[in-house]
């Protein structure tokens, strides 16, 4: 397996190019280019440009994050979209995603459970109380069978009857018939993460293909649902593959990109990998914003471990404009109230429900 490359400041500064006198942290040429191309013109960075941003030294990190924040404000506005997620069916998945504790193929401590309708409704109500506009129902499956589709139909109808919130879904690889049914049920947005770039995907998953995932996303878009597609950074990919991943997502043009930071799970093949250094994670946020200037870029799993409170604040002022509140699928998040308080401290408004419809 390859390991992530973190290049020293002296090397990355030369690769990125700078303007100014020697010995100073002059603005790198790539950031000057991005200011014109992305901030002023709204055009995303290409692969080579995104790679240069990812190779910037730490001395340019604050300048990168400031530019990414300006891009986010200009092309997305200042509001932050909040979302809650709930696992309808946890554990026992037949797939071998090497990062995932829900795989039934690994000796992980996650046990297989299912929630009932009453639990889903209560979770949706609690999510709505935080100001969140999205509630995503997730199931640990390769793709849904008829029983799961019927459960989804009952759950969606029950939530819609009692809670004023958009419903999203993430239940794996779909057929055209299943896509059409979810659309009819009122699913607002469908999540199916690529997880990593195409070239690294075979190192992460072997039980299904990249093309199966992208095929589902194309059907979702064609059906008129919003596409939510992101992944995990820090799973051993190289910095070049991280740039490739940003462009893979750019080519899909999703509404939302959830950005997870690798959090090693006991019993999985990736259990011994180290989490990303905080500055690498922040640099990734800035680079992804410059490659995806108009997308919702959402803080997802792993931010508590990788970034902490200070890093999360820097991310929200460095390109992030959406967050998952509460817990994740197999890891603890943090109380939603803390995220609401943080947004207030940063003077970032929460996106209203009517702004998402």
UniProtKB/Swiss-Prot annotation:
Report keywords, A-Z.
2Fe-2S, 4Fe-4S, Biotin biosynthesis, Iron, Iron-sulfur, Metal-binding, S-adenosyl-L-methionine, Transferase
Q: Which cofactor does it need?
A: [4Fe-4S] cluster; [2Fe-2S] cluster
Q: Give the enzyme's main class according to its UniProt record, as a single word.
A: transferase
- Which Gene3D superfamilies does its entry note? Aldolase class I
The residues that hold [4Fe-4S] cluster are 93, 97, 100
Q: Which GO terms describe its biological process?
A: biotin biosynthetic process
GO molecular function per UniProt: 2 iron, 2 sulfur cluster binding; 4 iron, 4 sulfur cluster binding; biotin synthase activity; iron ion binding
What is the superkingdom listed in this entry's lineage?
Answer: Bacteria
Biological pathway: Cofactor biosynthesis; biotin biosynthesis; biotin from 7,8-diaminononanoate: step 2/2
Q: What is its EC number?
A: 2.8.1.6
Q: Does the keyword Iron-sulfur apply?
A: yes
* InterPro entries tied to this protein: Aldolase_TIM, BATS_dom, Biotin_synth/BioAB, Biotin_synthase, Elp3/MiaA/NifB-like_rSAM, rSAM
The entry describes its oligomerization and partners as: Homodimer.
**Membership in a protein family:** Belongs to the radical SAM superfamily. Biotin synthase family.
Q: What is this protein called?
A: Biotin synthase
What is the native source organism of this protein?
Answer: Corynebacterium jeikeium (strain K411)
Taxonomic lineage:
Bacteria, Bacillati, Actinomycetota, Actinomycetes, Mycobacteriales
Gene from which this protein is expressed: bioB
């Amino acid at each position: 397996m390859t390991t992530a490359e973190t290049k020293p400041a002296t090397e990355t500064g030369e690769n990125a190019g700078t303007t100014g006198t020697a010995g100073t942290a002059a603005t790198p040429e790539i950031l000057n280019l991005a200011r014109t191309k992305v901030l002023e013109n709204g055009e995303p960075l290409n692969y080579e440009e995104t790679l240069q941003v990812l190779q910037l030294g730490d001395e340019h990190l604050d300048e990168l994050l400031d530019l990414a924040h300006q891009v986010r404000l200009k092309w997305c506005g200042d509001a932050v979209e909040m979302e809650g997620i709930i696992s309808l069916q946890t554990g026992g998945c037949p797939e071998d995603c090497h990062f995932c504790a829900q795989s039934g193929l690994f000796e992980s401590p996650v046990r297989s459970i299912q929630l009932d309708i009453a639990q889903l409704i209560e979770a949706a109500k609690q999510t709505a109380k935080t100001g969140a506009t999205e509630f995503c129902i997730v199931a640990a499956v390769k793709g849904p069978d008829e029983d799961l589709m019927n459960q989804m139909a009952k759950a969606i109808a029950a939530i819609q009857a009692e809670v004023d919130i958009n419903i999203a879904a993430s239940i794996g690889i779909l057929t055209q018939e299943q896509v059409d049914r979810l659309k009819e049920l009122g699913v607002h947005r469908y999540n199916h993460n690529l997880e990593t770039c195409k070239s690294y995907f075979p190192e992460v998953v072997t039980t299904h293909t990249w093309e199966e995932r992208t095929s589902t996303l194309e059907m979702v878009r064609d059906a008129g649902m919003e596409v939510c597609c992101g992944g995990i950074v820090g799973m051993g990919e190289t910095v070049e593959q991280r740039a490739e991943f940003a462009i893979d997502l750019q080519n899909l043009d999703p509404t939302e990109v959830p950005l997870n930071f690798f959090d090693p799970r006991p019993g999985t093949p990736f259990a011994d990998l180290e989490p990303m250094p905080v500055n690498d994670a922040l640099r990734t946020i800035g680079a992804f914003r410059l490659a995806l200037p108009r997308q919702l870029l959402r803080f997802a799993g792993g931010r508590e471990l990788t970034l902490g409170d200070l890093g999360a604040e820097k991310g929200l002022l460095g390109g992030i404009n959406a967050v998952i509140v509460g817990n994740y699928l197999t890891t603890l998040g943090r109380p939603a109230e803390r995220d609401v308080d943080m947004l207030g401290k940063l003077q970032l408004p929460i996106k209203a429900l009517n702004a998402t419809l």
